[in-house]
Amino acid sequence: MSDGPETAEGDTDDAVQDAAVNSRVASESSARSQPRATVVGCLPPTPFAIHTTPAPSEHSKEKNVSRRLPTEKTPSRLATPQFPPTPVSSRGSIAEPSAYPSITQALRSCLPPQKDIEILLSNLSSMSIFCYKSSFKLCSSWPSEMTEEQIPIANLLYSETHPVLLARHMLLFAVGLQHLSPTKAIPGLTRHHRAIMEQLADSAIKLVNTDDVLLGTLEGLENLILESFYHIDGGNIRRAWITMRRAVMTAQLLGLHRPGHYRFKTVNKQNDLDPAVMWACIVSTEQFLCLLLGLPTSTSGASFTIPRATSACVESGNLPVLIPDVVRKIIERNQTHVPQEALDMTQKIDHELLGVVKQWPPAFWRPLQLSGLEVDSADAFWETRRAWDHIFYYSLVNQLHLPYMLNPSHVSQKVYSRIACASASREILIRQIAIRTFNPVTAGCRMGDFVALIAGMTLMLAHILSHCSKGTENLLVHQRVGDRATVERALECMESMSEQHEDILTAKCAALLKNLLDIEAGPAEARSDDGQKDDQNVLVVKVPHVGAIKIARDGISITPFDTEQEQVSHDGVTIGGFGSIHVSTPHDSDRDGDHQADVVTPNDTASQATTQVVRPASARKQWRPVSQRSSGDVFTLPEETFPDASAGMEEWLFQGLDTAFFDVLISGAGEQPLNSTDTEGWNFVMSP
């Protein structure tokens, strides 16, 4: 007998429900009924969520995207599809909640009071479950094709007896709370809803998700995926990556990487989890996080096939199903050390991406139509999901061509890649701005914020490089004003998110983009009225094993690591994960007189200059000074200052997205690390 909850029938009255609850209290091992659960959810949390579709009927094949958009008759809430789970060769069921009484009791002790649960449920009752189902559960492609049966979602008033199922409810409830505005005041609560959210998530993660014994079921794997999405929407990309790595290992132990040879167990026989869809989600999510962070993937040889994923996926715009291997191929290209081989791979992947565009109907690429839609409506979800497919596609174009933006070895490819990156970045920013303008409160779509950061940096660097061209060689001159306005609007969205969520990451994103905007303003603005050169904002990036890039109004230059220069300390904003980015501003220069640095030799770390890292006012921790070693305009973070891999948001700062970006930008594809004789072609000087 399963310990999982069974979905109540739609016509079950309150009396029957109360009787069922009393029966459960009397005997937890007996079958029980649960009231219709509140529907909770969010907008799509990631641009790579897996959306599978059933085989289309003859009638559905005649429909195009525009005709299949939700209408006013479309159900507003997602319903459970009637497809059975994928057949497995070895599948068991666990029905022993009594084996973990201490864990269950510990989880229940972390639940908020019943009054708080009731109040929070009433505030979450209008939100949809779309992102939860579209992320890793088998669901129909369009609301009109779904049944009327509602999906039961976490109602902590009727807590589970098995710790895995109870942890699932706690994580789902936390995800729902995550999409309430942090500034929203909910009367009647004993604690702020964000504190309740953090306690629910932390307890489920520490007591269940970190216990390997409880990860041998599909439901345990589901909890890891939920945890990863929770970290993504919380802005902690590194912890999401670590969690997804654990999900990869767990899924492999359950045999999900071998269709037809599964060996997993389930806690609840009535669950609708599909192992093939879960594996596809895990692989695509892990690979995309690796691409953004500049880390190697653990699923390079993995493949997945979605059952019932037919040509209907093309109509619905299910991009991860159509091009599941592109992310992996880009990561492999980035790790190639033969320039010609890397160039051939780049051109082949580019051709593959262009082929994907031809598969989709023209209506799929029409401008977004979010105006006038309700935030939690089905129409808004499908439109946002389409925007996510766009962002995902253009982010792949960006990542593919970044290595050739600065590379002097391939002139023709450099021009093509620079235009491709600028165009893709522009499209990403436009769509992310539309999403944030439509719903500026929710913590969802956080992955889009990170992708938009990379897009904004790329677009500004493309214009800075264009200033180094003369006359008609500046191919972006007519787009400059519009692109600057787009980046500035993206900044406003980032600052709004930072203020609402006390988010250090978005605050750092805004600070960096502001400096790039100021640098891009041009050499003419760098001089004062009397003709004297004014102080500049200078962006200096050190990338491990590659070199240091200096971006200023007078151009871009790269310094190899083995260049010996006088060691000077500078105050400024230091950010970074594996390396560091240092922004030196005129205001910092004014303060340098009071902070003279000691000269540091490679063997003398005792005399390192100490600077205070600048933090936004929203930071919730008191930061200690960070010791730095500097060489000219090169700034490093000593090894002991790096936080643990699972550290919180404050410790990780930029999460490594910054240095991963510049690592690819500077090193190129298939190129060897720079040395003192290789930098001449990499220096760009502004044209007068």
Curated annotation (Swiss-Prot):
Annotated protein name in UniProt: Probable transcription factor gsfR1
Applied biotechnology: Griseofulvin is a spirocyclic fungal natural product used in treatment of fungal dermatophytes.
Biased composition (Acidic residues): 1-16
Broad class of where this protein is predominantly found: nucleus
A cellular component term, taken from the record's GO annotations: nucleus
Ranges annotated as spanning the membrane: none
A GO term for molecular function: DNA binding
PANTHER family: ZN(II)2CYS6 TRANSCRIPTION FACTOR (EUROFUNG), ZN(II)2CYS6 TRANSCRIPTION FACTOR (EUROFUNG)-RELATED
Positions with biased composition (Basic and acidic residues): 58-75
SMART domains: Fungal_trans
Function: Probable transcription factor that regulates expression of the gene cluster that mediates the biosynthesis of Griseofulvin, an important antifungal drug that has been in use for a long time for treating dermatophyte infections.
Subcellular location field: Nucleus
GO biological process: DNA-templated transcription
Biased composition (Polar residues): 24-36
Protein keywords: Nucleus, Transcription, Transcription regulation
Annotated stretches, region: Disordered: 1-95
Domain of life, source organism: Eukaryota
